[in-house]
Amino acid sequence: MMTFDIIIPTYKPGAELIALLNGILIQTSRPDNIFIINTEERFWKTEFETVLPVNVIHIKKSDFDHGATRKMGAELSKADVFICMTQDARPKDGRLFSNLLSPFNDEKVAIAYARQETDEKAGEIERFTREFNYPNKDRIKTSEDIKTMGIKAWFCSDVCAAYRKSVYNEAGGFVKRTVFNEDMLMAAKVMEMGFKVVYKSDARVIHYHEYSMKQQFCRNFDLGASHREYKEVFEKVSSYKEGGRLVKDTALHLLKAGKFYLIPKLVFHSAAKLIGYKLGKKYDKLPKSLVLKFCMNKDYFK
């Protein structure tokens, strides 16, 4: 029987972590271990440990990194597969893990990631964006798909993603330093090695963000900076085409839904994303004061 562990980085956890742990509690497949890498012990509450047995490792904020922190968790796991999750992801039903792990019966599958959905509180644009990025159809991706899918071939999200430990180790593990995109960098590596990345649409979590225009700018600045930092990977493909298709499809959806009044918001937010991304790709040429003003993850750029 396949063994699996869960790795959850946390920072100032609250009710959302309780919801996640309760969601794990009702799963038909239960993890062997739950490793929580918590940033700053003073923000941790012992009540989190009453829902399920968890292994908690506390780190300083200055030591947190999207790659290195998950790498630490992966090194703690001795299971066949480990699943990375974020503290604000919530299982949609009791079959999240059983559905997410089912592709690993194929030994060529290295990674499987879950579908992200919204709840009734989400706005129309965010809901459609999640449906665009996480459709109701499975997808098996290999290096052959890079020609037709571009950067989307490497798309993967550690909001909820499972990794075959043996292939992960063979690929060298997560990068130790990155503002984010450790998941896509790993997907690119395993595809280059000849393995598959699977999107499982029936493995579902509730996860979304209603970002302001400024937050969209800052998040995409970090995205651009990540693409610049690992240009040897990301320069192989273009991301502009995919972004343009999202804007076009969202606008058409809003018109068909009779919500044309949201189109100005879509335009302004999309412009903020594009400008942020382009500036992020030049982060190493900008004054540090501007980088710290533009970025979302300020500790990373200090």
List PLM regions with ranges:
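Acidic donor-binding loop at a coil-to-helix junction in glycosyltransferase catalytic cores
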Residues: 180-186
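Short beta-strand/loop segment that forms part of the nucleotide-sugar
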Residues: 21, 32-41, 57-59
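Non-catalytic, C-terminal membrane-associated alpha-helical segments of glycosyltransferases
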Residues: 222-225, 229, 236-302
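Glycine-rich, basic loop-to-helix element that forms the pyrophosphate-binding segment
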Residues: 60-77
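Short, well-formed alpha-helical segments that are part of the catalytic scaffolds
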Residues: 13-26
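A recurrent flexible, glycine/aromatic-enriched loop bordering the glycosyltransferase active site
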Residues: 143-163, 179
